Amino acid sequence: MTRDLVLFGDCRERLKEFDDLARMCITSPPYYGLRNYGDEENQIGIEQSPEDYVNELVKVFREVKNNLTEDGTLWLNMGDSYYNYRPGKGQGLVKQSVSKTNQDLPTKCNRRGNKLKGYKEKDLIGVPWLLAFALRQDGWYLRQDIIWSKPNPMPESVRDRCTKSHEYIFLFSKNQNYYFDVDAIKEPTVDGRGLKRKKSVWSVNTKPYKDCLLYTSPSPRDPH
């Protein structure tokens, strides 16, 4: 297998080109309704409802599963969104664009006119768990939810709830038995005399990358 290869393009198409199988996939898809990348027809994240968004990602990860070894795993980072519907103004979820030239695009992703059934103004949608349960229904084994705790979260001006400072990382496996090296990720004990099992809350600072879509997620180089 070729290593250190970066492929550009739509993952829904590029995944079909793979000849070799991978043992692990680590990814963080575009979150629902939080950003406009300027490609209205093809981008993921501006669907008309959370359910449409989840269904699209289920299809993506179905292709991912086809490219995993039988003992392979999927590590999926996913953040949540709030429902924001104003009568007469529609549903405004997309607040910013990666590209300044796309921030004022007069497209459906900037303001949706439909009111979503089952959601109230200011509701936390619960997108990570909607996706997790949908992937489980599609055949994935949902093995664990990991909390990514952010010591330096994005400031929020909201005054009627706590500042959001965590996201989810889900561990999925293709089959019941899969590769997981528990010893490789053990952490030092408090006294420094031994090692202990890694726990399911990971404290990782976010780091800005001005040339990388202003986005970051925890990686194997951020193990703490």
Residue ranges and their predicted role:
Residues 4-10:
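Conserved SAM-binding strand-loop segment of SAM-dependent methyltransferases
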Residues 11, 21-122:
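SAM-dependent methyltransferase catalytic-core segment centered on the flexible catalytic loop
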Residues 215-224:
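Single conserved hydrophobic/aromatic residue that forms the stacking wall/gate
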Residues 131-144:
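A SAM-dependent methyltransferase catalytic signature shared across enzymes that methylate proteins
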Residues 31-35, 82-84, 149-152, 176, ...:
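Feature marks short, surface-exposed loop/turn motifs that line or immediately flank catalytic pockets
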Residues 143, 149-201:
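Flexible, glycine-/basic-rich loop-and-beta segments that form/coincide
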